[in-house]
Amino acid sequence: MRQAVIIIGSSYGDEGKGLASVTAAKEKNAACLNILINGGAQRGHTVEWPDGRRHVFHHFGSASAIGAVSCADQDYIVNPLLFRQEKAELEELGLRPEMYVSSRCRVSLPWDMMLGQIIEENRGAARHGSCGCGIQETRLRFLHSPWALSFGDLTRLNKQEFTAYCERIAREYLPGRLRRLGMTMDQDWKAAVESGEMIRRSLNDWEYLKESVRMYDDWKTLSAAWPVLIFEAGQGLALDAENREDYPYLTPSRTTSQESARRIAELPGKTETEILYVTRSYLTRHGPGPFPSECPKEKINPDMIDRTNVPNPHQQALRYGLFDGKAVRRRILLDLSETRKILPEVRSSVMITHLNETGGKLAGDEKLENFIQGFDRCILSDRPVFPE
């Protein structure tokens, strides 16, 4: 019987989904297809090998660390520039990552990234917490048909046609979008657009991406070849695009397990499915927005250091909070109830990471033994390195 594990962050992202994906793949001990189901390369899922190697996965599934094949499904946003950078990093670590890309994937280009960063800069103190990868701007560009060429569409263009497409985005779409927003580019941005180097590099990056991956049209045919499917969602339930309570401090994609469940439901036969909800033993949030349990890091552990979520111009410094068991449980139960409308027999599990930083317990008033009640199983992790 085919098996599937859906990896879901239970809060604001950065819960440990990279470790969870590798752990799930190792447990299955079979050939895995690791599906990137939402968002884009703004995700940052960290994996640490027992031999000391370390990588933050953006454009590849985290389970590719142990040989799984990655799959960018139809709602994932592909970025040729960031793909090329990451593939080179993985090859330096001794990996030869393989990847399938849906012909329906949207493709993010440097002008989308530029727009997102200009807009976020103009918000000043009211910034939303963009990662600077152009995810929202790519989604918005694809609402307008002249600019909405999918991965499959772009593969049918020759080099001259692809270059012309990029030139039109740079000379027509980009200034038009800024004009509608009442914004302008500073001299540095203008120089980057007018130099022509961005277009030349975009063509090279696109050709590299196109030659490095395998495109698929039919999800059922692709998935039939794999006994294990690991769906790796980006971000977390509290950042879901439909979470109106925290608007606009959200990610522009659906972060729930329903997206993966629908893909599983399309497949013939039965798929034994588990949702693995991931949480740290405390909470974090990178970027602005509501954070009810926020506290100084020192209240949790003054000595802990997050090597992945370093301060940056887009999201500033990582924020810390006590473990809010009531809020985490509410998000999980709501997500699970919706997914069981699609897959009634789905099992629910929880993985708690970073326990080494909180003395093996949850940071706050919630008792660990109380929180894990009601789940089909619980995985406790007190070290960042995946098990051998």
Give the predicted meaning of each segment:
Residues 1-388:
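Non-transmembrane, aqueous-exposed alpha-helical and coiled segments at domain scale
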